[in-house]
């Protein structure tokens, strides 16, 4: 029953994996974000319409008809793999064209990300005075540190920083909302990612009997071959941790050149891992096991690179929250009825599940 419900859930978008951006009703909110990472702009009004105006033009265009923007049930706007060119104004209007909420978003170029690790003695960029049609201060506005990506054992944490410009006596603005149509090339005008070592105790309240994904991979059975693994639910906005045969993979080792058999993708915050040799790879999001990738010899040329199967084991609560989001009310109702009428003897008992998918 649980496996069936999970397969139903997997057919729906993993909205929980995307960053939710909110703004008070009737307000205008300004955000700096990173290109390449999905976000959802909240509106929460039935049958609302979304309009967009880029930083290069004043004309509003309907977002509902664009391939890179999708209006979700409830009228929130999903932006998949946003580009720097999508920097601009996003306006949510009701059916009378009255403003419900408005976002000014600067999607800063992830390809320009400046990366430093505190424990390697690397320093982030400092403040810099520039002349951009007048004297301004360019600086980095930092998000809070994310949680440590491991507990009990040594781990790492990261924080994101965004490029901001401040004029004398004026409120700071994200760099490319400030510059708009101006074409300026300067190495200081870019976002940042800072890393450092950490160690924290485990949360004893964390649940351990939840499903996680398991994949069998056949991509490493030839010399000089490699595979690109993707951790479900991971993003640059969340703590992510990888292990190879139970040994931790760290940003410090990678940035210092000590890791040669794996490459964590910096621009996705570790969501993707490039591997060059067979091993059992496991990924964790917010300290919780999400997926395991098992090396398996190729049995036939026609076999898919990912082979699904199901077996029992432990997992954690991140995927439970995803399940609650993706299951429809009707599925929950039917599931509850079956549990009450058909599966009454086993209802209420915790069972661990491993879900293996293509």
Swiss-Prot record:
* Positions of transmembrane segments: 323-343
Give me the Cytoplasmic side stretches, as residue ranges. 344-358
> What InterPro entries does the entry give?
FAM187A/B, Ig-like_dom_sf
Task: List where in the cell it is found.
Answer: Membrane
**GO cellular component annotations, sorted alphabetically?**
membrane
Give the Extracellular membrane side ranges.
Answer: 18-322
The residues that carry sugar chains are 127
Give membrane topology per the record.
Single-pass type I membrane protein
**Protein name, please?**
Protein FAM187B
């Amino acid at each position: 029953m649980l496996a069936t419900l999970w397969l139903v859930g997997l057919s729906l978008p993993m909205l929980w994996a995307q960053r939710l951006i909110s703004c008070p009703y009737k307000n205008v909110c300004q955000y700096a974000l990173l290109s390449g990472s999905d976000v959802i702009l909240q509106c929460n009004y039935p049958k609302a319409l979304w309009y967009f105006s880029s930083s290069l033009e004043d004309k509003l265009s309907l977002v509902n008809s664009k391939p890179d923007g999708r209006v979700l049930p409830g009228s929130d706007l999903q932006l998949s793999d946003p580009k720097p060119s999508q920097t601009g104004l996003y306006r949510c209007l009701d059916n009378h064209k009255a403003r419900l909420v408005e976002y000014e978003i600067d999607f800063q170029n992830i390809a320009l990300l400046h990366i430093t690790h505190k424990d390697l003695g690397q320093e982030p960029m400092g403040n810099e005075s520039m002349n951009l049609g007048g004297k301004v201060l360019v600086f980095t506005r930092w998000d809070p540190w994310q949680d440590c990506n491991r507990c009990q054992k040594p781990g790492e944490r990261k924080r994101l920083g965004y490029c901001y410009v401040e004029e004398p006596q004026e409120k700071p603005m994200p760099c490319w909302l400030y510059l708009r149509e101006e074409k300026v090339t300067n190495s200081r005008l870019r976002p940042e990612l800072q890393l450092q070592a950490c160690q924290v105790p485990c949360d004893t309240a964390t649940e351990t009997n939840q499903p996680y994904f398991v994949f069998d991979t056949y991509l490493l059975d030839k010399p000089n071959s490699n595979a690109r693994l993707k951790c479900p639910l991971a993003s640059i906005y969340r703590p992510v941790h990888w292990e190879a045969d139970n040994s931790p993979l760290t940003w410090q080792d990678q940035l210092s050149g000590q890791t040669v058999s794996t490459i964590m993708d910096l621009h996705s915050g570790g969501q993707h891992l490039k591997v060059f040799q067979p091993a059992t790879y496991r990924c964790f999001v917010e300290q919780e096991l999400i997926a395991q990738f098992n090396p398996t010899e190729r049995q036939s040329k026609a076999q898919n690179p990912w082979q699904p199967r199901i077996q029992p084991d432990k997992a954690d609560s991140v995927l439970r929250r995803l399940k609650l989001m993706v299951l429809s009310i009707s599925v929950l109702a039917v599931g509850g009825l079956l549990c009450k009428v058909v599966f009454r003897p086993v209802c209420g008992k915790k069972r661990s599940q491993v879900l293996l998918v293509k």
